[in-house]
């Protein structure tokens, strides 16, 4: 892995004023810069504009070269606000792409797209940096072992299991619980696996980023007393930042994760929230650069940009990067080019349903729409596969019967169908689960349920032993033993009321 050991600051290699240009034009976050003949910077080189604005305030803006225009001009996209910049200002070509700090010193810290710490905890204690633009690992370096990554969330582990070193997409519209599910996964994985995580906040709400940071401090994932014991590095390029920053912040987070995989030889978790904002930022930049839009107004380079990010997220013989990506689905339309392009790269999809969220079933994971390439008997075993298929068949039959129930009522169903409906409603509720990160809001303590416990629970439901229990007993519990305990409590309460 290519790293630099000398820098003058996180985002920029050592500056030697050998290649200077001047700003010729400014259009929002896009700068046209004129350089002397024969001194043109390369595509993706970092350019730095320093100086003072009209009020005497210092200016330090980093840009990235995107196009060579001819006539000794380049077009670059700024990574921060361009307020105060003027034509004629001096621009320094750093001669290299953006580089960010990597290694153990990044854990417990919050960075921006340039790799500068933004948490007011002082400079990062590392001299090792790495460029954010790299090629994906060669075929000969890839690892092809298939193993399950247990999350402790029943519906995920049973019906759409995650692959260790795979790519997982969380699909859902606005407000169905993507970010809460990501926070729960970070919490469970840090506690159960002791793994290192990198979180890339791409174009999401600043408030959510702040909430996540506070939540991590409370749960001990970030250790304030001893920052070196923290389990996660955070990289934010939020909604209020220019499109250049939002387009590149995913690469900054990925570069930090790659170092843990390639040099430290660790298994790493990379969370990206939200991959659609990465696409949207690319679309904005594409329009600013004057490219003709493609389908639904997206950039013509959508597949290429997505591929350059996704192909670097993989397992090598040194270690693995397991990536969990939230994918906002515009207007709940899964055929939109952005989610459709993302689908092609994923090993598992966790689809969040507005219908389940409206019923109050959380996590609102749709058991029929969520998929995984890992759900095969040779990988998960016959027992797991059989139970998962029975759960899906029961829920599918319930879905088919809902129209009949709505028109004619339950009484018109056959005895067999009535039993199917009763069990399906219990399964639906048993797939809900109290989360550790939602304890503050729900008042229920979070539950981590191992895969073996989950399978045992559904076996008991299908055996008929629990047919007499009320369906409320299955709602927001951990394992099946809690269901019987809750049913007894409900029975006691109803007797006391009488």
Curated annotation (Swiss-Prot):
Q: How does it sit in the membrane?
A: Peripheral membrane protein
What are the record's GO terms for cellular component? chloroplast thylakoid membrane; mitochondrion; proton-transporting ATP synthase complex
At the top level, the lineage of the source is Eukaryota
Q: Could you tell me the keywords of this UniProt record?
A: ATP synthesis, ATP-binding, CF(1), Chloroplast, Hydrogen ion transport, Ion transport, Membrane, Nucleotide-binding, Plastid, Thylakoid, Translocase, Transport
Which SMART domains does the entry link to?
Answer: AAA
Q: Which organism is it from?
A: Beta vulgaris (Sugar beet)
Q: So what EC number does this one have?
A: 7.1.2.2
| Entry's Gene Ontology molecular function annotations | ATP binding; ATP hydrolysis activity; proton-transporting ATP synthase activity, rotational mechanism
GO BP annotations, alphabetical order:
proton motive force-driven mitochondrial ATP synthesis
Subcellular location, in the record's words? Answer: Plastid, Chloroplast thylakoid membrane
Record-given protein name: ATP synthase subunit beta, chloroplastic
The UniProt family comment states:
Belongs to the ATPase alpha/beta chains family.
Question: Which SUPFAM superfamilies does this UniProt record tie to the protein?
Answer: C-terminal domain of alpha and beta subunits of F1 ATP synthase, N-terminal domain of alpha and beta subunits of F1 ATP synthase, P-loop containing nucleoside triphosphate hydrolases
Q: Which reaction does it catalyse?
A: ATP + H2O + 4 H(+)(in) = ADP + phosphate + 5 H(+)(out)
Assembly and partners are described as:
F-type ATPases have 2 components, CF(1) - the catalytic core - and CF(0) - the membrane proton channel. CF(1) has five subunits: alpha(3), beta(3), gamma(1), delta(1), epsilon(1). CF(0) has four main subunits: a(1), b(1), b'(1) and c(9-12).
Specify the enzyme's EC class, one word: translocase
Q: What is its main location?
A: plastid
